[in-house]
């Protein structure tokens, strides 16, 4: 289990007892403000605790959905446009307008670590929106993987989501030409 400092205060009762638990190796300080009863904690678990409202997106979401075997160097996290800058070398922050942030948001689970991630349907829209920014080979790999699972996806949900984004006609046209 992973805790913030405030959660440790609730659990142990005082800063003194937290320090005592640390000294007795009942609790480990993972990084500033993050503690765990286990010595080894995944980066994903740390980031979901530190940034609970952030949503895995882009390269990270493509990887966790099994659409690419390229392990991202950074964790791509979507936050509301009005959010403050997240200062963390492990992440790439993607600002998303408030009216679009929750579209396709779902909960994922990786080895008991729960996290927010965009659905495969939402990520297909993101792939089509940002195809000119992504490396061509990477884009093609993910697109081909989408073609293989297209019958598992909810097409009406994709169309509904796409209509809420700017340049929705371009997204829908690319969906029809390149995926369906």
What do the PLM-derived regions correspond to, one by one?
Residues 3-7, 17, 35-180:
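Nucleic-acid-binding surface
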Residues 10:
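Short, surface-exposed ligand-recognition loops at beta-strand->loop->(often short) alpha-helix junctions
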Residues 18-25:
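Basic amphipathic alpha-helical segments that dock to polyanions
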Residues 25-31:
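A short, conserved structural fragment
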């Amino acid at each position: 289990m992973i805790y913030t400092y405030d959660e440790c205060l609730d659990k142990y009762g005082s800063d003194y007892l937290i320090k005592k638990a640390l000294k007795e190796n009942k609790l480990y300080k993972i990084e500033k403000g993050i503690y765990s009863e286990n010595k080894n904690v995944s980066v994903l678990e740390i980031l979901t605790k530190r940034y609970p409202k952030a949503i895995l997106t882009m390269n990270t979401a493509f990887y966790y959905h099994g659409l690419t075997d390229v392990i991202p160097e950074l964790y791509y996290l979507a936050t509301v446009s009005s959010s403050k800058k997240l200062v963390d070398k492990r992440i790439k922050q993607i600002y998303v307008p408030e009216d679009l942030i929750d579209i396709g948001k779902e909960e994922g689970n990786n080895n008991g670590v729960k996290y927010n991630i965009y659905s495969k349907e939402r990520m297909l829209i993101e792939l089509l929106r940002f195809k000119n920014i992504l490396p061509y080979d990477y884009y093609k790999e993910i697109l081909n993987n989408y073609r293989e699972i297209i019958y598992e996806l909810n097409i009406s949900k994709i169309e509904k989501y796409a209509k809420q984004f700017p340049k929705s006609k371009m997204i829908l046209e690319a969906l029809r030409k390149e995926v369906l």
